[in-house]
From Swiss-Prot:
Keyword Methyltransferase assigned: no
Protein name in UniProt: DNA damage-regulated autophagy modulator protein 2
Expression tissues: Expressed in the retina.
Species annotation: Mus musculus
Coiled coil: none
Length: 267
């Protein structure tokens, strides 16, 4: 049995691979058509102009769905492992809410480009990155609370390092972007897709975009740490029938149907 066939480990793997492919495919398309510069554009800039905008939107929406699925499985796993720990239960619920909000922001980024509705696009990006960062932080606290009985110390330290990486990237991005957009670097700096080294604010732009890419890769690394955990969990779906027909009838007891969530049982 391959490693990705064990439990639900394919979920975080698919999330990372699919999201990375989204960024790479839209980047290659935008570069090939000369819609952006090769040197570190904003991630969303590679999905601003058709046809890469269509590709970016569709693929990023699917990534958001994969993200919610991954976070929900993580929520169910932590809940099953700690059914009576009040602190862990509260943190686990908070983590799920933060994760869903982050995925909502990701979907907003996918569907509202900065060239059309800039405010909505920025709100989506802030939601995705900020809630995603807090989600990582909460999950790291959960890892600390559950080690060494359930989680190994190594997993906690790896996740802590990834959270620190994410925090440094976020701080760099916020600082440089605030200076870039609040200073007098021209009226089109917000919508600008092509930058030259002699342009005002070029260095700030590069640092901001580099921090954005760096932050995204810290997310990738964090979700990859879920693979080993997800090898030890499966989910099932249960159909409860209220009658023997689909007409309006008096409810009668019938046998419930139970099948694996994905039509096969990974053991």
């Amino acid at each position: 049995m391959w490693w990705f066939q064990q439990g639900l480990s394919f979920l975080p793997s698919a999330l990372v691979i699919w999201t990375f492919a989204t960024f790479i495919f839209s980047y290659i398309t935008a570069i090939t058509l000369h819609h952006v510069d090769p040197a570190l554009p904003y991630i969303s800039d590679t999905g601003t102009i058709p046809p890469e905008r269509c590709l970016f939107g569709v693929m990023l929406n699917i990534a958001a769905v994969l993200g919610i699925a991954t976070m929900y499985v993580r929520y169910k796993q932590v809940h099953a492992l700690n059914p009576e720990e009040n602190l862990i239960i509260k943190l686990n619920k908070a983590g799920l809410v933060l994760g869903i909000l982050s995925c909502l922001g990701l979907s907003l980024v996918a569907n509202f480009q900065k060239s059309t509705l800039f405010i909505v696009h920025v709100c989506g990006a802030v939601l995705a990155f900020s809630m995603g960062s807090f989600y990582m932080f909460v999950q790291t606290i959960l890892s600390y609370q559950m080690q060494p009985k359930i989680h190994s110390k190594q997993v906690f330290w790896v996740r802590l390092l990834l959270v620190i990486w994410c925090g440094v990237s976020a701080l760099s991005m916020m600082t440089c972007s605030s200076i870039l957009y609040s200073s007098d670097f021209g009226p089109d700096v917000v919508q600008k897709l092509h930058w030259n080294p002699e342009d005002k604010g070029y260095v700030l732009h590069l640092v901001t975009t580099a921090a954005e890419w760096s932050m995204s890769f810290s997310f990738f690394g964090f979700f990859l740490t879920y693979i080993r955990d997800f090898q030890k969990i499966t989910l099932r779906v249960e159909a409860n029938l209220h009658g023997l027909t689909l007409y309006d009838t008096v409810p009668c007891p019938v046998n419930n149907e139970r099948t694996p969530l994905l039509s096969r049982d990974f053991q």
